[in-house]
Amino acid sequence: MFFRLRFLVFFVLFRNLCCLLLSGDLFRVYGLGFNLGVMIALQILVGICLSWFFFRCIIPQNWIFTLLIHLEFDLGFIIRSLHIIFTSLLYFLLYIHIIKVIFLCLIFDSSMLVWFFGFLIFIFILIIAFIGYTLPCTSMSYWGLTVFSNILATIPLIGIYICQWIWCSEFINDFTLLKLHSIHIFLPFVLLFLIGAHFFVLHYFLSSDGLLDRFPFYYERFFFFLLYYLRDLFLIINILCFLIYYICIYWFFVFHEESWIIVDTLKTSDKILPEWFFLSFFGFLKSVPDKFMGLFLLFVLCFALFLFILNCILIFIYCRSSLLWMSLSLVLFYYLCVGGFLSLYVVLCFPLWMEIQFWVLLLFCFIVCRLD
């Protein structure tokens, strides 16, 4: 039995990683999924290194945040900066990946299972990133967790119980961080399983063909093992070299000013501004005065991606009116995301130049790698 199971596992890996025939008309943008997988693997590896020292920073002294972790062991601050920058880069690549697959879905048919696992991966990444955002226990993350947990308390019937389960008390304390830390460690391994399922289903249905594959005169095929591995690795190596250089020179650009303030439970922060990849969701929560309606709009935003699964079902039953679902989901997800992102920056007057210079250089790195 063990031999058969081992043979099945190696056969699936060999088929999906080595012997898969893909189109020769795949641009470098198609390698964003591979880059996302590498970034998630690096995030988990760096997070495991940080988790060994998290308890030592939190338990002995109340509300001592992990920005001082560089005093505990060598290279601790560099590892923490890598973990934070990898998160920003992960979301940057993730949003580009979603734009790419929406474009492909507007042109070609897509598999329902591929979209389903991709939707679950997106939701899990959101949950893991928000929990990780609250773990450093800075002034910004503490009040951000307080605001979001109070919003969850507005859910009818079960909201107050969810809030008390998260807090483990009448207020946020050390045990709250320990529980969130355990969840933050457990969920990435579930995410790896979903990524494996997404990877297998994608290669099984071959739902990301090139543009020229729809024409009968184009038959060029290549093995996945050598050509596309080298192209994807070249892109990810350029990105990692750029990030390491940026950390060594401008290591402070990933932190807001409130990230250096120790938590004062009796004083609210002057402004509560999450990371850039949470700005659209934060804008939905704050767009209406009622907390429950803001939470409802947040679920509508996440449900916009789920509409693509309905689109795949409608295509499967040959209902061409599915373009309505695609248009609705595109408007809900991206126009509202960009609107919430820009409105928060305009209202809060946050200085953009620190982050703009990073993303401009990153786009330059993509141009150097040639997206062809």
Swiss-Prot record:
Membrane topology summary: Multi-pass membrane protein
Compartments reported by the entry: Mitochondrion inner membrane
Protein's name in the database: Cytochrome b
Family that this chain belongs to: Belongs to the cytochrome b family.
Database matches in InterPro entries: Cyt_b/b6_C, Cyt_b/b6_C_sf, Cyt_b/b6_N, Cytb/b6-like_sf, Di-haem_cyt_TM
Annotated binding of heme b b562, by residue: 83, 184
Subunit structure: The main subunits of complex b-c1 are: cytochrome b, cytochrome c1 and the Rieske protein.
Key words of the record: Electron transport, Heme, Iron, Membrane, Metal-binding, Mitochondrion, Mitochondrion inner membrane, Respiratory chain, Transmembrane, Transmembrane helix, Transport, Ubiquinone
GO molecular function terms listed in the Swiss-Prot or TrEMBL record: electron transfer activity; metal ion binding; oxidoreductase activity
Needed co-factor(s): heme b
Function: Component of the ubiquinol-cytochrome c reductase complex (complex III or cytochrome b-c1 complex) that is part of the mitochondrial respiratory chain. The b-c1 complex mediates electron transfer from ubiquinol to cytochrome c. Contributes to the generation of a proton gradient across the mitochondrial membrane that is then used for ATP synthesis.
UniProt main location, coarse: mitochondrion
Transmembrane segments: 32-52, 77-99, 114-134, 180-200, 228-248, 297-317, 330-350, 351-371
Leftover remarks: Heme 1 (or BL or b562) is low-potential and absorbs at about 562 nm, and heme 2 (or BH or b566) is high-potential and absorbs at about 566 nm.
Gene: MT-CYB
Binding annotation for a ubiquinone: 203
A GO CC term attached to the entry: mitochondrial inner membrane
Gene Ontology BP term (one): respiratory electron transport chain
Binding site for heme b b566: 97, 198
